[in-house]
């Protein structure tokens, strides 16, 4: 007979396991609605909240034999119940999902998880979400993407009226029951500086010296992380790097994955996704162009890419770099994509042969002092997505440049699957199925698996839309995985962007193999972008080989004939 004033319901986990969902799925919605009706019968003014399910970790013993899929079906059923009954839907899944260590038995949250759930309920009841908050990308000197509807989103207390204004544009909205709010402003033309103002009745945020221009995310592993001051052209280019309209957001790791054992405080921070240093947008001013400062420590490839865009487009350019040395592709893919499309790579990842041996060994050394069986590491599948992509909160960007693959070159077949998942994962995150994605083909390090990997990267040009590949092997080093000649590579990425994204009359690439045919005992190779083809040094062509059906290759003499190689 007790009629509660507030009711919070979290039901459905036990419908996934024990395994009664196949037998009782048809009763779930009906029974849930009857439960809600019973509380309303006891108190007609009751406030009812129902929760999306807490996660189930992929290490659950029956994850792939129904539990994963039934969990997803029940989530949808709960959302339908909320819509049908008009009760408030709260989310226990989202705040726990990036922290699988909290699910000690793969199902039940520990005390830390219970605290997060309690916070979620408290905020839902009170509407207190900590007031107006923005993504860490919102700082003075930021660059906003031009010429597209500009979405600005954040958190505020439930029901708070939020006003966003920039230039002559202003939009107002109200924060939802979950504290989230979003406005979409009319497109901004390239220019500035502007002041971006975001306010509620209690809080007034202002961001000064804001520009509208082209924003690109620059990501990958160590060759993207490789700093301008380390490049072979640094001495000449750093003194000339000052540019008020080139802005840099440099996300650097708090701890490098060197050959060391990390201490307990580091390990705990990693578990809570506190891996990147706090940073802010920096301007390429003369002071910042000095050695050992913002531009000198920024990614060389990203800098040369951005500089070529600046010179060619004559608009502001903002570069966000979150590259992490040694990181494998799988670390950058969202958890749901791997759970549903490549779950094998998640299982016992530190002992998993899909993960490169060096990656596993370095991670094992770094976390050696941890007693937590679910200890996290930057190289773990999903980790860098959850710590380095998710916090960007869909900040509007034009596209992505990517240099990675060294930590996946041992298994090009798996990488092909992972790379496609990566591109789709990020496009889904930014809600842009055509998000440009331009990547670097691995260099000419003398490792047996790398030619096969490079060929796989080349073939993916024809398998994924809106991508481009910059060749780097002619500027590589057979003995050094980190060649210092970065300027041509960054500019080659820029040529893809200028041609494909900005429709400029620029040839995007050197010759790219299209096909072969045999005539008179000779092989004729055809190429895209092959007009005017010649050797880079003016000497006879080198490094060509041919094979019979047995697959054994032999050196071959090659020459350019028109737009073909014979």
Predicted segments with their positions:
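Alpha-helical cap/lid subdomain in secreted, periplasmic
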Residues: 2-129, 308, 381-473, 477-514
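Beta-strand-rich binding/interaction modules
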Residues: 154-156, 160-168, 523-525, 531-553
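Conserved SGNH/GDSL esterase-like catalytic core that processes O-acyl groups on lipids
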Residues: 1-33, 57-59, 69-72, 187-190, ...
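Secondary-structure boundary elements
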Residues: 222-295
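Acidic/polar residues in short coil/turn loops that connect beta-strands
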Residues: 104-106, 176-178, 550
């Amino acid at each position: 007979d007790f009629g509660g004033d507030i009711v919070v319901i979290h039901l459905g986990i036990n419908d996934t396991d024990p395994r009664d969902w196949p037998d009782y799925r048809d009763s779930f919605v009906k029974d849930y609605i009857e439960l809600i009706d019973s509380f309303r019968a006891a108190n007609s003014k009751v406030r009812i909240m129902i929760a999306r399910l807490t996660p189930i970790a992929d290490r659950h013993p029956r994850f792939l034999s129904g539990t994963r899929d039934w969990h997803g079906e029940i989530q949808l059923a709960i959302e339908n119940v909320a819509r049908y009954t008009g009760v408030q839907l709260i989310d226990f899944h989202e705040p726990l999902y990036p922290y699988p260590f909290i699910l000690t038995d793969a199902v039940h949250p520990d005390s830390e998880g219970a605290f997060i759930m309690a916070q979620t309920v408290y905020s839902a009841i009170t509407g207190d979400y900590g007031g107006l908050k923005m993504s860490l990308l919102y700082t003075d000197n930021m660059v906003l993407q031009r010429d597209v509807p500009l979405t600005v989103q954040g958190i505020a207390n439930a029901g708070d009226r939020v006003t966003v204004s920039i230039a002559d544009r202003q939009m107002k909205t109200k924060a939802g029951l979950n504290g989230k709010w979003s406005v979409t402003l009319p497109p901004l033309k390239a220019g500035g500086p502007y002041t971006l103002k975001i306010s509620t009745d209690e809080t007034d945020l202002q961001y000064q010296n804001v520009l509208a221009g082209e924003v690109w995310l620059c990501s990958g592993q160590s060759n993207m992380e490789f700093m301008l001051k380390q490049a072979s052209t640094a001495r000449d280019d750093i003194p000339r790097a000052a540019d008020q309209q080139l802005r840099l957001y440099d996300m650097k790791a708090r701890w490098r994955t060197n050959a060391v054992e990390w201490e307990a405080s580091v390990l705990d921070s990693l578990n809570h996704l506190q891996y990147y240093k706090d940073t802010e947008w920096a301007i390429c001013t003369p002071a910042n162009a000095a050695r050992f400062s913002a531009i000198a420590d920024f990614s060389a490839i990203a800098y040369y890419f951005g500089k070529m865009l600046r010179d060619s487009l004559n608009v502001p350019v903002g570069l966000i770099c979150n590259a992490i040395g040694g990181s494998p592709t799988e670390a950058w893919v969202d958890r749901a994509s791997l759970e549903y499309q490549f779950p094998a790579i998640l299982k016992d990842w530190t002992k998993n042969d899909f993960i490169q041996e060096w990656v596993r060994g370095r991670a094992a050394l770094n976390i050696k002092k941890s007693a937590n069986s679910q200890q996290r590491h930057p190289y773990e599948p999903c980790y860098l997505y959850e710590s380095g992509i998710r916090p960007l909160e869909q900040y509007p960007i034009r596209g992505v440049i990517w240099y990675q693959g060294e930590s996946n070159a041992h298994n090009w077949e798996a990488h092909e699957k992972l790379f496609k998942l990566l591109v789709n994962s990020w496009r889904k995150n930014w809600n842009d199925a055509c998000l440009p994605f331009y990547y670097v083909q691995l260099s000419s390090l003398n490792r047996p698996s790398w030619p096969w990997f490079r060929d796989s990267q080349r073939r993916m040009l024809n398998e994924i839309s809106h991508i481009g590949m910059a060749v780097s092997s002619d500027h590589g080093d057979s003995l050094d995985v980190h060649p210092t000649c970065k300027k041509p590579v960054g500019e080659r990425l820029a040529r893809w962007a200028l041609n494909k994204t900005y429709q400029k009359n620029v040839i995007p690439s050197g010759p790219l193999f299209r096909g072969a045919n045999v005539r008179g005992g000779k092989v004729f190779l055809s190429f895209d972008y092959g007009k005017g083809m010649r050797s880079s040094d003016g000497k006879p062509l080198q490094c060509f080989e041919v094979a019979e059906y047995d697959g054994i290759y032999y050196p071959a003499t090659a020459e350019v004939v028109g737009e073909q190689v014979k």
